[in-house]
From Swiss-Prot:
GO (cellular component) term, any one: membrane
Main location group: membrane
Membrane topology: Single-pass membrane protein
Organism: Eupenicillium brefeldianum
The encoding gene: orf5
EC number, as in UniProt: 1.-.-.-
Coiled-coil region(s): none
Residues linked to a glycan: N37, N118, N171, N345
Protein name (Swiss-Prot/TrEMBL): Cytochrome P450 monooxygenase orf5
Length: 489
């Protein structure tokens, strides 16, 4: 038989190979369409065959959450979005998939940054719990108290820029981005990058944006993302960013701690371990996580909240009155302003930080959501954008009504689905710092200025201009700032 095969001519060999590939393709197609354990779930025909469908939806405009929302309108609570992937908005799914007792683990998408595995991309639950301890110390109440002076200083720098530019409309998105990245940059590397003070864009901010946009296009094809991030020439920006992080960490260690920062806690945990090459790469990965997860999401929330307030004068005046009554703008005093937190929550409901949801993988035995069985080894995602606008959970779901979280609780039918910072053991560790930044920035602006959309700033244009690059990135927002008589420092 071996002699027969070796005696094949080139043409015969190509034909044999073609028949083999065609047979393989047909068998995979038939299996995925009719015999796969997800064949009973509805969804686009092409999605059943290939993950390229989901990647195509994302790449069209980087509005994946809008595309997923449309699919749920067509197919219902469960949509098959890939050969072994489901998008789910059944209200019962939240605790089953993300809760503290979930049997699901993080999906394969979290391997993209290996071997620079950060806390968020750690799939093993035991290792995640071990690494989480250092992060919990770095974001504890005591630690946050030490970060507050730095946040206040940067808030004042943001206000100085608004003071100087307020005679004309201001693209507030640009300056809020710099504000959020400056905070996390200083907490990660223990030094100022002076993006606000010197009116400049730091090198790392440009690299992050380029990297995140690339990830937004390739995120739903992990194997292609893996190749892209490891192919010379294509991965140059990615490699430049990691070299920059390595250099900044080396400088931070050489300088020592000058003021409280998150890195100190992560580095202490690193020093208590074997300090292997793998540990060092994971420390670099954690630096990436602090900057990206703590910046994009916070900046987007601040910008979108300012947009909603600029469109709602009566609500803004009511909030300003409550802020004016405070003796000072401290983190402690701002936490007590219920309407401010309600506005933040409503912004996160309408514009969640990760709108298309985060990926999980079901255990081999599968899971039940109510009476619906989800087979094992299935990738599942809960699109927060759609879930948070579900009329089964929220009255007037597409309207910005912060009072649903204060004086009008009847507008919230099922509060268990609202998890803007996730829930369970994987809940956002930096939640309280993010809220401190948002409260500080928004309160400082409203105490000093009345805000309105600038002439020519279109509401729909702003909302439609956002980018879904896994995290939500706000479009440019032009606001008019008018100085108030009442001011609070």
């Amino acid at each position: 038989m071996a002699n027969d095969v070796s005696g094949l001519g080139p043409t015969a060999f190509v034909r044999l190979l073609a028949f083999h590939l065609i047979g393989l393709f047909v068998s995979i197609t038939v299996y995925r369409l009719f015999f796969h354990n997800l064949s009973g779930f509805r969804g686009p025909f092409i999605a059943r065959l290939s993950s390229f469908y989901l990647a195509w939806l994302s790449a069209k405009r980087l509005h994946l959450h809008d595309e997923i929302d449309d699919l749920h309108s067509l197919y219902g609570d469960y949509v098959r979005t890939g050969p072994r992937e489901l998008s789910i908005i059944d209200p019962q799914c939240v605790q089953v998939i993300y809760g503290s007792q979930t049997k699901c683990i993080k999906g394969p998408i979290y391997t993209l940054l290996d071997p620079r595995t950060n806390l968020s991309s750690t799939r093993d639950k035991t290792e995640h719990a071990k690494r989480r301890r250092a992060w919990d110390r770095g974001f504890s109440t005591t630690a946050l108290h030490t970060y507050e002076p730095m946040v206040q200083e940067l808030t004042e720098e943001l206000m100085t820029i608004i003071d100087e530019l307020s005679e004309n409309p201001i693209n507030i998105t640009e300056w809020v981005d710099k504000y959020a990245f400056e905070v996390m940059g200083q907490l990660t590397f223990g030094k100022p990058f002076n993006m606000l003070k010197e009116r400049k864009e730091a090198y790392f901010l440009e690299l992050i944006r380029q990297d995140m946009n690339a990830i937004g296009y390739l995120l739903n094809l992990p194997w292609l993302s893996y190749l892209f991030l490891r192919t010379p020439g294509l991965n140059q920006n990615h490699l430049n960013f990691w070299r920059w992080i390595e250099n900044e960490f080396a400088q931070r260690i050489a300088r020592g701690q000058r003021r409280p920062d998150v890195f100190n806690w992560l580095h202490q945990a690193y020093l208590q371990g074997p300090q292997t090459k793998s540990d060092t790469l994971k420390l670099h990965g954690d630096g990436y996580l602090v900057i990206v997860a703590g910046s994009d999401t916070t900046a987007s929330t601040i910008t979108h909240l300012l947009f909603y307030l600029a469109c709602n004068k009566a609500l803004t005046q009511k909030l300003q009155a409550q802020l004016d009554a405070l003796e000072g703008l401290t983190d402690e005093s701002l936490r007590d302003v219920e309407l401010l937190d309600a506005c933040i929550n409503e912004t996160l409901r309408l514009r969640p930080a990760v709108p298309a949801g985060v990926q999980r993988e079901t255990p081999k035995e599968g899971i039940y959501i109510g009476n619906r069985y989800i087979p094992g080894d299935t990738i599942v995602k809960v699109p927060m954008y759609t879930l948070f606008r579900d009329p089964r959970s929220f009255e007037q779901p597409n309207e910005f009504i912060p009072e649903r979280f204060t004086t009008r609780p009847e507008l919230v039918k099922d509060k268990s689905v609202f998890i803007p910072f996730l829930t369970g053991s994987y809940a956002c560790v930096g939640r309280r710092l993010a809220l401190m930044e948002v409260r500080r920035a928004v309160a400082a602006i409203l105490c000093r200025y009345d805000i309105a959309l600038a002439p020519g700033q279109n509401e729909e244009g702003f909302l439609d201009g956002k980018i879904d690059a896994f995290t939500l990135v706000a479009a440019p927002l032009s606001l008019k700032f008018t100085r108030r008589h009442q001011q609070k420092q």
